[in-house]
Amino acid sequence: MIILFDLDGTLIDSTDAIVSTFHHSFDMHNFVKPTDEAIMALIGYPLDIMYKELGVQEEKIWDFVYTYKEEYRKIATIKTLLLPCAIEAVKEASKIATLGIVTTKTGKYSKVLMEHFNLMGYFEVLIGREDVQKPKPDAEPILNALKLLPKDEDVWMIGDTKLDLISANEAKVNSIGVLSGYGKKEEIKMFTNVIFNDALEAVKYLKTT
């Protein structure tokens, strides 16, 4: 079995880090700041898409992204928390499957975070934004992860937003939606029939399948 985990809202809570870094970038560029709610509603999308949706002009988006990344790497480990049961979920999953991370976050920062939490050693692969041309909801991130892992027909993607689940559907792999993050249950139900409160519940389910 292969289990692929999303990060934000699935294993970690980086809401504070993301929101504060967005505000920093808007301050640095003298741009009207969006509300916390507007930012949180877009978590899971690539940074350039988030800035576009928040009203930044096309030609300035990558300047904002650069400012964001410069600040985020300074504060990520300080302002990011593991979700309850995340450690147990990963440890239990490692007993029954080969593990990977598929995230829209920058991969190198994601690796630093996982090393900070002493969890990176459980994962055989980590696919981040810089590793793909087309991020989730495209199938590419999952397919790229699978190319780097031993072939296995029993593949599961665990994530908290429709982006994770659509990506899984496009990649023709199984999916589990979790309610520990940013996706609403009504929306998640549209893309998977398997839904649990958190990653640990999802892993316990997979131990019985």
Annotate each predicted stretch with a short phrase.
Residues 120-135:
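A short, structured active-site edge motif that brings together acidic residues
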